[in-house]
Amino acid sequence: MVLSEVDIVKADPAAASQPLLLNGDADVAQKSPGSVAENNLCSQYEEKVRPCIDLIDSLRALGVEQDLALPAIAVIGDQSSGKSSVLEALSGVALPRGSGIVTRCPLVLKLKKLVNEDEWRGKVSYQDYEIEILDASEVEKEINKAQNTIAGEGMGISHELITLEISSRDVPDLTLIDLPGITRVAVGNQPPDIGYKIKTLIRKYIQRQETINLVVVPSNVDIATTEALSMAQEVDPEGDRTIGILTKPDLVDKGTEDKVVDVVRNLVFHLKKGYMIVKCRGQQEIQDQLSLSEALQREKIFFEDHPHFRDLLEEGKATIPCLAEKLTSELIAHICKSLPLLENQIKESHQGITEELQKYGVDIPEDENEKMFFLIDKINAFNQDITALIQGEETVGEDDSRLFTRLRREFHKWGIIIENNLQEGHKITSRKMQKFENQYRGRELPGFVNYRTFETIVKQQIKALEEPAVNMLHTVTDMVRLAFTDVSMKNFEELFNLHRTAKSKIEDIRTEQEREGEKLIRLHFQMEQIVYCQDQVYRGALQKVREKELEEEKKKKSWDIGTFQPSSTESSMEEIFQHLMAYHQEASKRISSHIPLVIQFFMLQMYGQQLQKAMLQLLQDKDTYSWLLKERSDTSDKRKFLKERLARLTQARRRLAQFPG
């Protein structure tokens, strides 16, 4: 179960009045009479707080942030805003200082509170390097060394992370990401576009909805003019995930203290998460080597004695310990709120990458025997997909249709063409009969059908279907060829030589099978020039035609009471129409079924079988295995990249599943 914000509050009911212990305050707390009760509450709080932060830290360490945004607190501020001093006060260690750009890489600051240990431990890690630090005074040197390694010796910046992990009884449970200070113009040997680069880096982090933006602003400047708060407002216009930190309250001009108090009380520039005010070591105190623990004591005294700011201390809005408590609570609540969505995003990304990785297959083996088995598997998979196409059993997308379904549509069109041919034939027959009666009728008695005329009309009608049949063959051939090519693309896309070879086979066999299919179709229409039908079949068809016409004649309304006698021409035409209709029905049955059968046999069955045999024959030449299995130059890199992402997300899912919340 994921912790809710209510659970966090319940875990430590004294949180509002008992700030987390930092540095020198620890000794004071040990002498307090309520320390045992506080320790029990602290223990309950630790059981819920630390696992949440550790979970996100472990996901970040895995590199999951390369794939998905993780809950975080990003610290931003203008140069000389006091950002480094705030982080030093929270962490208890000195961080790089100086003029110009000091933070040149994003610094992930992991603070882990040790409850029952007095030992201080530190660790710096970046790229593939990691070093344990046993003395807090070594931190600054190691951070500078890391920045020089990553971003160079100059003043350049880098997007690559440096992680500083500190475990101590004097730090809060908290993880922050420190970003470079905002600069407006390049100075000294800084790159001319340094300001743009820094803002781009900062925006990369603060625009994520999963990030709480911690904006550090000096108390002695107009808050509306600060670049850091302006950038935060751009990505968080409602101020829902921004916290303001005012620094250097000792430098506020007299008479303007009330304005600072109004800012901290959220009356000037509203932020949903509000403001805090802190006083860190000044430059003179740093030069005098004032310890961080003593600086905390002085900070507390400063706010207690200040006539305007003491109320802010009582409200829990002043001092580093109160800030640490607020940040920890905000981070935990933010993590708990984000976990369900994060878990779902990781699941979806894992599924998507798994599907994408399947397209790239497995790594090509180096051993020759293993190459043979690998090639056999690839060709067998291809042949199985071809078989599925031939049998109309291939798997298709929701909006797609199977090849056989599309072929049936073409064959249905063929039936319509035949029917239209019959209708057109009636018109032609009528004209020819009129011409015969008017110009060529010889000694035949009225009403007699000229068989040669009947035969000529039948042959012409059927002959007119030959080219449409051949055109249908070409259409179906293209459909099958494209389907086979898609199968090759699916199975051999990354093996470009094998894909090219398969396409060549597909084209060669297509030409051969199309030629054979066309030959048989034309042969069929040559045979159809022989007017023939079984006697009993033809008599039955003719009888049905006559019965149908007789039935239709009875339904017609008579316009004349007297007996109507049709002319000899009309009788002859009616008779020949009946014969043409009867013969056309039987011939149409033959043609409408036989032509699709021929096309299916040559352009689907034989085409597919010959292609499968041709692909298996590739296995006979072992010298071509390496050539056939040659990948595209970027395929191996892409596969490796996807595998690394999949491994990260797999571990992330495992850790989320093990999370005790």
Swiss-Prot record:
Residues 178-181 are annotated as: G3 motif. Residues 367-631 are annotated as: Stalk. Residues 279-282 are annotated as: G5 motif. Residues 573-661 form the GED domain. Residues 247-250 are annotated as: G4 motif. One of its GO terms (cellular component) is microtubule. The gene is MX1. The keyword Hydrolase does not apply. The modification N-acetylmethionine is found at M1. It comes from Macaca mulatta. This is Interferon-induced GTP-binding protein Mx1. The keyword Transferase does not apply. Interferon-induced dynamin-like GTPase with antiviral activity.
